[in-house]
């Protein structure tokens, strides 16, 4: 069963929520605070840890009224203001908000497994047409579903646990 936005808040699954604008019917909106563009290749070995590709920070345009990223078509790593703490009986994915999709952007999310936790969630975004995205714009939404209980020893303990991305902070 998919949780409602209110249930997600009550269970403390998402942190740093914009409680005024971010709670939706079936999820929580996520605000972007950092964007880096893919600029090299990676390696997925048979054994061992993934070698990540290179990502280059995208500079923010700063105007008196707003701060934003001007994005050209490409593949981007994104960092959100919100964090998460996934309990042992839930899993989560992210999807783009319809406004981003209408502008030619698609969020590419893997599953956030039971036991995963971070102060700032991250995901990936494919941009198909040039677009401007403002700092802290709500571009993604959580989808949290109940699962069978995962045993303590089987909870997520992978290489991305508690990873902190370096993010750009907007200036106003």
Across the structure, where does each feature detected by a protein language model lie?
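DUTPase catalytic domain/fold
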Residues: 1-172
């Amino acid at each position: 069963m998919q949780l409602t936005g209110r249930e997600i808040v009550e269970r403390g699954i998402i942190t740093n929520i914009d409680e005024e604008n971010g709670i939706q019917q079936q999820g929580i909106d996520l605000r972007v605070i950092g964007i880096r563009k893919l600029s090299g290749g990676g390696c997925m070995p048979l054994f061992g840890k993934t070698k990540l590709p290179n990502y280059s920070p995208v500079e923010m345009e700063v105007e008196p009224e707003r701060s934003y990223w001007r994005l050209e078509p490409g593949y981007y790593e994104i960092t959100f203001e919100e964090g998460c703490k996934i309990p042992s009986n839930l899993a989560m994915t992210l999807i783009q908000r319809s406004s981003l999709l209408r502008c030619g952007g698609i969020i590419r999310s893997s599953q956030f497994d039971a036991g995963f936790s971070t102060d700032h969630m991250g995901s990936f975004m494919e941009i198909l047409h040039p677009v401007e995205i403002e700092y802290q714009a709500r571009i993604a939404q959580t989808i949290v579903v109940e699962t069978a209980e995962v045993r303590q020893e089987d909870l997520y303990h992978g290489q991305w646990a508690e990873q902190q991305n370096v993010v750009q902070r907007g200036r106003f």
